[in-house]
UniProtKB/Swiss-Prot annotation:
Belongs to the ATPase A chain family. Key component of the proton channel; it plays a direct role in the translocation of protons across the membrane. PROSITE patterns: ATPASE_A. GO terms for molecular function: proton-transporting ATP synthase activity, rotational mechanism. The keyword Metal-binding does not apply. This is ATP synthase subunit a 1. It comes from the Bacteria. GO terms for biological process: proton motive force-driven plasma membrane ATP synthesis. GO terms for cellular component: plasma membrane; proton-transporting ATP synthase complex. NCBIfam families: altF1_A, ATP_synt_6_or_A, PRK05815.2-3. It is a multi-pass membrane protein. The chain crosses the membrane at residues 20-40, 78-98, 113-133, 174-194, 196-216. F-type ATPases have 2 components, CF(1) - the catalytic core - and CF(0) - the membrane proton channel. CF(1) has five subunits: alpha(3), beta(3), gamma(1), delta(1), epsilon(1). CF(0) has four main subunits: a, b, b' and c.
Amino acid sequence: MHLSSDEVVLWQSGFLKLNLTIVTTWAVMLLLAGGSWLITRRLSTGITISRWQSVLEIIVTMARRQIGEVGLQKPEKYLPFIATLFLFIATANLCTVIPGYEPPTGSLSTTAALALSVFIAVPLFGIAESGLVGYLKTYAEPTPIMLPFNIVGELTRTMALAVRLFGNMMSGDMILVILLTISPLVFPVLMNILGLLTGMVQAYIFSILATVYIAAATRTREKSTS
């Protein structure tokens, strides 16, 4: 038994390794890219639209509303990044219904990469709204004494994002393995359903936290323009 899909090495040449995490990550990305192309290739602005377009419009509308409720005044600016995070994590977790599939979100390297993308995006959005000087001033609020604490807080919350998602996904897998040894017939079905629900919740929480961090980084500019 292995704790992470990182341990499953499919190919190796010297220090180069191709593990299961990389394969499943690219598989999820290709699935999302292919699905997006199929859904958007025949978009219509008429009265009659396809079923898939209806689903897509519902998802986009809900995402924009949720981003706006967090406090961002222009949800469309942040929608591509936030929605991509949610769809990747949700799709990766929902694919656990496929036999033999192990979600890349069960790997600390994947969750760390997702958290790193948020860590990079937050100052970029903040600088775009407030300018470089305006954004850097937020680290000295409410007093310059708080500068080192704010910097440490920025780093630790990024680590928390990665560890939270990894820990929740890993604990779900471990519980499933334990219950399989107790009752191999009933518990797996119930735990798979619970696992899918947990995966969706974790995708939602990760996306919301990313939105909150971006809202905090852009709050100075939005306050000045309101």
